[in-house]
Amino acid sequence: MAETKDVFGQEPHPVEDDLYKERTRKRRKSDRDQRFRAFPSMEQSALKEYEKLESRTRRVLSNTYQKLIQSVFLDDSIPNGVKYLINRLLALIEKPTVDPIYIALFGSTGAGKSSLINAIIQQAMFLPVSGESICTSCIVQVSSGCCVQYEAKIHLLSDQEWREELKNLTKLLHRTEELSREEADAWNRDEAVEEATWKLQMIYGNGAESKNYEELLRAKPKRKIPTSRVITLKAEEAEELSIKLDPYIRTQRRDWDGEAAEMRIWPLIKHVEVTLPKSDLIPEGVVLVDIPGTGDFNSKRDEMWKKTIDKCSVIWVISDIERVSGGQAHEDLLNESIKACQRGFCRDVALVVTKMDKLHLPEYLRERKAGNQAIQSQREAVLERNEMIKLQRTRILKEKLKRKLPADFKVLEASDLVYTVSAQEYWQQALLTEEETEIPKLREYIRKSLLDKKKRTVTKYVTEAFGLLLLTDSFNSTQNLPNEHLHMSVLRRFAEEKVELLEKAIAQCFACMEQPLQEGVRTARTSYRCILRACLVRSKGNQGFHQTLKAVCLKNGIYASRTLARIDLNEALTQPVYDQIDPVFGSIFRTGKPTGSALMPHIDAFKQSLQEKMTEIGIRSGWKYDSCKKNFLIQEISAILGGLEDHILRRKRRIYESLTASVQSDLKLCYEEAAQITGKKACERMKDAIRRGVDRQVAEGMFERAQERMQHQFQQLKTGIVEKVKGSITTMLALASSQGDGLYKELADVGSEYKEMEKLHRSLREVAENARLRKGMQEFLLRASPSKAGPPGTSL
């Protein structure tokens, strides 16, 4: 028999092969160690243990998959049960390790978002900070990865997306009549006109604002646009990439006459992704997202703005010390963040107050209420003021969250709702220590979030894999086949009864929305005129508002710019409804103790009842000899119903936004009519057209239709949940009883894989216990360590 040869026709050398395997093992270990550089040694140990568990589990699954494929490869037909196993194994093998944790830094221009990111990643001036020039409204994502260089990918609008924006920009600038000098001055001072003019000039040069849509389509941009619509920048050092990136994400003043080609492309930028090499401070798997506070005039960028907010599991509302105690912009940011908790994946909201080193000591001492201790230095004043701000803003934020969210929502239990940070002091440490700037505290939060998610994900992954291996191994067993059909019939009837009860429980849960919806609709009907007046009337009249209002109409009731507060007529009109439904909506989609209004606890109770019944039937009917089957059913029920949570979260956003989407759809013709108005007193005539259109739609039941559409969305979710549960459980029971139903096929022996998987599953408890022990040791050491003193030279 010929000896086995490798693909190059040479015999493999055992010594060289061993050396290659050893080098590969060391390289993988080194890569894993590099990935965890951002964590302290105790947390690194926990992560490595979980990583090892996951890696070994994937290897066992891959070996099992290969054996199953080989055992059925030549068969004309594959039993349904085997197909199910193969598909589930493949899905688990290809499942991502951990979905990234997106942390939004959400704030207005100048709030200090970029400075904060620079401090967190320990790269001063890496992202351009807002000075005399302001940054673009594009989203910037910063993460660390396995790359060896610093890299930035600048994603541009597609040709179709730019054409859509170009059409709206030219409509905005189109004049059909001669204007008086006063009217022309007002036109030129209109913020929307200035923005549109500037964008066209940046792309096509001076004079572009006077050309029509067709002329600009034929015009050649000042800078060549890559056909891939992606610009990739790379550099060996952070400073080098920063210099290359700066022109793309910093927009210059409107009176700037420079000719740098990079500067001229910013109106086309959709978003930017920056990847750092493996970092000592930011772990791989965390994405910091710099999100501007107002959205964008371009539909795609604005849609991405909202979707990015909704996919973030953590939102830090960034506000500097001079703006946090008032101002509509700050309130708007908080409201948008709370809505993200309702409609998106957000589980944690915190206020990050920046520039906390700013303090005028004489003024502070004059306004300071008499305290127990006299202030001796600037440092003491800053620390006292920071603590006071933290207490005040925590109380205010908690009260605001309580009005909108369920009382047991996780964010309300957070130990830190407000952070007081100073990026400048982090670098200089003239007044505050590094710890007192709270930058390390934010890094610790990031690490803890990733570590907790890794633990949950790996535990779920190993448990799910163990369930599959249990059944795969039991397929080759022929014990208790005569009684199998009876066992499954009892379980199937029980499951059908429980599904009916679950459907009723979901219906009762969603019925809780009916009363607040009705009350909200009544309030909206009586208050919509006042709301509309507040949106349409400006304190300084129509000066500078004419084309801004036209932009609102061109975008179906929404206008977002880099400098003005976001305008959303549809959201404003439906706000009275949201004020009524928000607490109940949050209660429905929360996790916690089972109540009449919470959805997930009902699904958890359904899961528990099925698992208990399986255990009961197993004990009573002899499954003690086939514990693999019982354990598989219990594990698979968890996997099936666990997957429902993602489905529910995805539908939640559509349900929540159905009110504004309905109103926007009903007012579409009204907006289109108003956008066509030109000539004398066009602004007032546009307002009248909007008022008439809204009056007409309200009289015809606009708010009632919005209510019906939301209720229809809830009904669709209920139907989807029940159908998914029925289908999955039917498939699972058919698989478990496949031997008795004639679907049995002898498979390859996976006994060794099952034994290894059993060991890995037992290891979960040991790893969790080790992690708890390390955490306790770490907390003890932190308590025992002396607190840091202030920087030298700070006391009088």
From Swiss-Prot:
Tissue spec. comment: Expressed in germinal center B-cell and in lymphomas derived from germinal center B-cell.
Enzyme class: hydrolase
InterPro entries: Dynamin_N, Nuclear_GTPase_SLIP-GC, P-loop_NTPase
Main localisation: nucleus
Coiled coil: 158-185, 745-775
Subcellular location per the Swiss-Prot or TrEMBL entry: Nucleus speckle
Gene3D superfamilies: P-loop containing nucleotide triphosphate hydrolases
Residue ranges with Basic and acidic residues bias: 1-22
EC number: 3.6.1.-
UniProt: GTP binding residues: 107-114
GO MF term (any one): GTPase activity
Any one GO CC term of the record: cytosol
Known function: Nuclear GTPase found in germinal center B-cells, where it may inhibit function of the activation-induced cytidine deaminase AICDA. Reduces somatic hypermutation in B-cells which may enhance genome stability.
Protein known as: Nuclear GTPase SLIP-GC
Annotated organism of origin: Homo sapiens
Lineage: Eukaryota, Metazoa, Chordata, Craniata, Vertebrata
